[in-house]
């Protein structure tokens, strides 16, 4: 959904209206300095006229009725040294709105080699977001990663084909004729233009301009059943991390605990490798300056396994500090929910935390 690109549309329009980057910087602030970060600094890692933007911004706003504004959640895990049982605990709650029909349904899948319970999405087998089996459990929050880019493209018509400009040369664009079947209505014919950045979703290439969207989910997509099955069969946190290797979209945070005493935080999904400039606005697709260079390697995504502080908290706040070597995103939620969870956890008597305590913290949010 386009809600991930709405901040870029807003900043692009402000840049046009306010007349420059300095004016924009006074209006749009980044993540507040000193606010809580999921994976703190010091963690080691391996490794022109913009036609169509106004209509795209309007379309994104109209799409909000589908419920995408209700994203966000809380999740945390704590070390066994802080619990009455001596084993780690994990807690998570979804901030979904009251959907009808509901987006989540609780399922319990039990068969030889599999015993898992959690939240499933209708039409998709397995439980991936909030779930546990006999050995490992996890809670999910939205990762707020910037995985969509908007590319303003230059087009021309000629020689019986449509072309777009890239690095001073003209390339053939792919043009598809699609038919949308409408129940109880007439079919709708649609021409779709595709560049190497992605499909054009705004503007009119015949006029010379269009806006293409780049999104990891537009490629081979997410093999959800494969990831869900591997996750439900995982026996510990490391196996769960491996299960998420094939996950593409959306990018999520996971608070995790297992029966071997491991706890912590995992980030899962495909995040394009590119500069932070892509995150601020719609970019010029014809220059070659804003290209993707693959995806952040799965083993180098933000991760905290058995952190020394004894807990891991993810409440949609920034996931990695400035020393993280890759650009992840700009639009994170301020720390306030995460800081409240942290305070409540630290108020608990060390070595005495229970499931009931976790439930009370949920009720405090």
For each of these PLM feature ranges, what is it?
Residues 13-41, 47, 208, 212-213, ...:
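N-terminal leader/propeptide and maturation segments of large enzyme subunits in energy/redox metabolism
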Residues 57, 113-188, 229-233, 334:
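Compact, glycine/acidic-enriched structural inserts
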Residues 220-221, 230, 235-241, 246-248, ...:
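Ordered core of a single globular domain
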Residues 122, 148, 249-348:
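Hydrophobic alpha-helical segments
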Residues 1-89, 94-100, 118-119, 127:
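Substrate-recognition/specificity elements adjacent to catalytic centers across diverse enzyme folds
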Residues 72, 120-122, 205-212, 219-228, ...:
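Flexible glycine/proline-enriched surface loops and loop-helix/loop-strand junctions
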Residues 96-109, 225, 234-248:
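Short active-site loop/helix that positions an aromatic residue
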Residues 11, 86-87, 98-102, 107, ...:
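Short helix/loop capping segments that flank catalytic or ligand/cofactor-binding pockets
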